[in-house]
Amino acid sequence: DFVTVGDFAFYDHVLNHSLRFGVVPARFGTEQSADNVDLSFRLARGRAPTGNDAPACEMTKWFDTNYHYLVPELIPHQTFSLSDRRLFAEVKEAQALGYPIKVVLIGPLTYLWQGKCYGGDFEKLSLLEGLLPVYAQIFNELMALGVTWVQVDEPILALDLPPTWQAAFERAYHRLQRRDLNLLLTTYFAGLEDN
């Protein structure tokens, strides 16, 4: 019996992760605010009450559902940093109400798989080593807040993955293991098949 934290989004959950990881296209500037609401709408619609207008990010279907998400724009040598801290505020808010919580995140491999390469021809999987330290930082900060369960959604496990992506799962989750943090790896839409 947990209250899930991390499943709310003003616009979409993939966009929340892009903001959290600092994956904001240069055309939108580098300044983020405490809540990033205006930035979210500039990314989604190209305009908001504050900031300069810019072409909106591409939107596409989340797998084969009718849910649409903003596609992360990944560039060669993409840097990732913990740039949006709303998740931790949401954890504290739920804890203050006395509820046991479980945090939910999109997994690093699904996040990269669902992104799109801009500015050159490169393999998205090459960005995994730069993204994993941000996940590790998130997990460490959640543990410091007393969180003991994190659900990590990896729906790409239901796809026919190339061997390089399959192998990356073991490598990634070996690095993300924490003794005092239970990771609930989830997938949906279909079975694991050969994954």
Where are these regions (language model features)?
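Domain-level signal for soluble alpha/beta catalytic cores
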Residues: D1-N195
